[in-house]
Amino acid sequence: MTRDERAGGNVPTHGGAALVGFAPGLAEIAPYRIDDWGRYPACHMGPAKLWELRNRVQAAASGELGERPAGIVITHGTDTIEETAYLLSRTLDPEVPVAITGAMRTSSDEEWDGPGNLTDAVRVAADPGSRGRGTMVVFAGKVLAGWQATKIEATALEAFGAPHGEPVGEVAEGRVEFTVGAHSCARRPINPPGLTARVAQIPMVVGDLGEMLDLARKSHDGVVVEAFGSGNVPPGAVPAIRRWLAEGKPVVLATRCPRGEVTPVYAFPGGGATLVRDGVIPAGPRTPSQARMELLICLSAGLAYGG
């Protein structure tokens, strides 16, 4: 991104060659080739584009685009890195490592973090210890499992974390150090033909009567409900949730809390235990957006939530 005064803000500008030019010394880490797939703001990445990118990465990893690489680096807008990282983690063979990175500042800023993050990502992708770890997010010196990584800061340089885990490694002084085994990064892949299902994500609000749930039910195949606390919703929303279930459409229950996961212990109307007894599915160790990606992938593959 660069600052465009006529547009009044930051816009996508640099292709792969330009980004590499800003990070001298990459060839000393590993030989590379550049694939300019596209220049899209992260918030423009819908299911079709996500799947197109996934297929491009799979083709590169299998050697269809040239010599089979030791690793792959993706530069990506930070807003939706977590969706892309989750998708790749769940649908690609983990043998060839994929390192996703980006920047929280633009090349117009003095403290641009892009070149440093790119260099770190190349180090991770090229490191022999990355083999079998699948997709990782490399940002501000942290290495995060792709299926756990989420954006936790809107503007800070250290923008990514793993609310349901911990970093799996770090890059410090040019060295990649992993703190856990490869099994902690990789997931068993699911292979849908595409992202064909439609999944809604609906946050609960105080006094919710389920209107948004009813509106979404007509055009979606499943829904992630972003509940309070350990998985509780206002009683007024319960009939709408039951209408989803009555139509055979899965309802996944996530929490709006930054840390922790749904624990169905409350049996009052709208309580998590009551909802699970009705057939609602706890999201597990996933943020609401990760739970939505999981449900989207599984429904597209004809599978139940959780693969």
Language model features with spans:
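Short acidic, glycine-rich surface-loop motifs adjacent to enzyme active sites
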Residues: 67-81, 219-230
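Short beta-strand segments
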Residues: 74-76, 99-102, 136-140, 203, ...
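ATP/nucleoside-binding phosphotransfer catalytic cores, i.e., glycine-rich phosphate-binding loops
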Residues: 231, 235-307
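Short Gly/Thr/Asp-enriched flexible loops that form oxyanion-binding sites at enzyme active sites
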Residues: 74-96, 233-242
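A glycine- and small-aliphatic-rich helix-loop capping segment at beta-alpha/alpha-beta transitions
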Residues: 2-17, 80, 86-98, 114-120, ...
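ATP/NTP phosphate-donor binding region
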Residues: 1-62, 239, 259, 282
